[in-house]
Amino acid sequence: MKKITAYSRLTDSLVSLNGIPCNISFSSEPGPGRLVEIYRFLEAGYPKFFKMDNLSKAGFLASEMVLRSLHYDMESPDESTAVVFANRSSSLDNDKRFQETISRDNYFPSPAVFVYTLPNIVTGE
């Protein structure tokens, strides 16, 4: 039987792994700046992180925490492993940004932003 073996949660005020709060002291206000603080706390060493949208950053960090806790070998992926992502607002942050690019006064659709309006892009990142 398949089961969830580890999970993480990221909110504006809490980062937890398997229900246990992580000891991260935030110096920034709630919001995207905290994602960078979590990244630095984890010492992830993945430069592409800084080019990601906020949803992908959160997904990357959540995955990094879970996979590390399971001692997952990134060099030899196991096909029986899966990830499940959930949030309450999907890609709303990017949806708003894309809407700005197609507003009547500023009509210039951005494919670079549009790709991040697809919630599953976080899995690819």
Regions found by a protein language model. Name each.
Residues 1-125:
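Conserved "HGTGT" condensation-loop signature of ketosynthase/thiolase-family condensing enzymes
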